[in-house]
Amino acid sequence: MSPVVFWLLMIFYSIAAVFLLVTAYVCLIGAPFVPAPKAIVSQMIKAAKLKKGMTVLDPGCGDGRMLLTACREQPAIKAVGYELFFVAYLLALWRTRNHRKQITLFFRNSDYADLSQVDAMFCFMLVKPLARNAAKYRSEMKKGALILSYAFEIEGWQPHKVIPAVPERNFAQIFIYKI
């Protein structure tokens, strides 16, 4: 094997190893990148009743579809997204490139985000990250703010409203909590 081929293979395997480690880390502390179905995104945004001047947050924004759809629905909102999976983050940056004035994206963990200005938070997270941050949500979010969680409940919280599942389309429930 030539030295050039050897080094190209080493670079390829190194990049693959880093990619796999980052993916494993993201899955351990949050959730894997699984985009919410478009119909669910629309339902969640409709349920949030977005108004001019509101701030919305997606703590695991993935490819940015929730934030982008929210901004198209109500152009006078501010949208903030956090993502740990680099490929999804890059995809979100690309998809939201024409909405930079409305959408701010961060490549970091949302556990340390400032929630004091958030009016609505859209979640498609597993039970553990929701439970881990439940006290933060309750103490930092505005009174009257909404948390809309697709598929997973916040342990120990009573939902304000539940949008029923649609089994024939493989859609889970949407749990809406009011602070």
Segments (PLM) and residue ranges:
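S-adenosyl-L-methionine
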Residues: M1-K51
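Conserved class I S-adenosyl-L-methionine
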Residues: G53-G62
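Conserved SAM-binding loop of SAM-dependent methyltransferases across substrates and taxa
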Residues: R65-P75
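Conserved SAM-binding motif I beta-strand of class I
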Residues: K78-E83
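Conserved SAM-binding loop
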Residues: A92
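Conserved SAM-binding strand-loop segment of SAM-dependent methyltransferases
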Residues: H99-S110
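A short SAM/SAH-binding and catalytic strip from SAM-dependent methyltransferases
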Residues: V118-R132
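C-terminal substrate-binding/active-site "lid" region of AdoMet-derived donor-dependent transferases
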Residues: P129-I179
